Amino acid sequence: MRYAILLSYDGSPFCGWQVQQGAETVQECLERALSTLTGAPVSVTGAGRTDSGVNAVGYVAHFDVPDAGETDAGGAGMRGAPDPAVLSYKLNAILPPSVVVHALWPVGADFHARFDASQRKYTYFLHRLKDPFVEKYSLRRDWDLDFEAMNRAAALLLGRHDFACFEKTGTDVKTTVCTVTEAFWAPYTPTHVALMGFAPAAPAPGADPISWRYMYFKISADRFLRNMVRAIVGTLLEVGRGKRSVEDFASLILPAGEAGADTAGTAGKRESLRSLAGDSVPGHALFLSGVEY
């Protein structure tokens, strides 16, 4: 029987989602816990890969358990298909604090967490002053940033384009075309600021409001290339600092298929395209923040 699972995880202890030899990953952690509880090997398929250190909120995966009578689920007298609430409770009891299961439910045998996903959302957090309460999940850059220019550049991402300039080199995907449906920067107020009335010392004359000292970038698309979001954020920060124009950013967003990524023998060209964009930002401030079906 097939089950879907909704979970969140802190990516800092893991070398990404996907199982890899000699490294602890979220997928392996889940498979180990499920195998312990069901008494049989369990393979977990996720909605997509996240890189080392990247976090997730609302991540979706699926797994199969043997038919009735073939296993003792959790050693609690449940044979075959386990009760979702019981299995969810037991999973949270043995999973590390860095992983939490929000829900678990039976799905059809043809449900696929990766291939059935129509949209994936990512959020990247940024702050501009020293703050120990957001440091772990946000990137601190105390630069003067032109958010109007950054949002004008971000709006150019919308639509179906070839994002080869933002793809990590050395990947083996057949196409670098993605359809982006949402991309923008916005301010937010952290919990400790909102609830405790905390505010840093009075800002210098003409400084921006405190709300714009904490901001995030949100992007949604049907699919993402490896390292794509981090490369986009790094390049948008160059726009915000005035080191790259909005027009130059626009030149990195290619018409669908222009990079020739659908054909063989283009690795060298794709590598040279990546060098045109900015540096990737660190992964600790990136969240896979939702999956739609």
Which residues does each PLM region occupy?
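Structured-RNA-binding interfaces characteristic of tRNA pseudouridine synthases
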Residues: 1-293
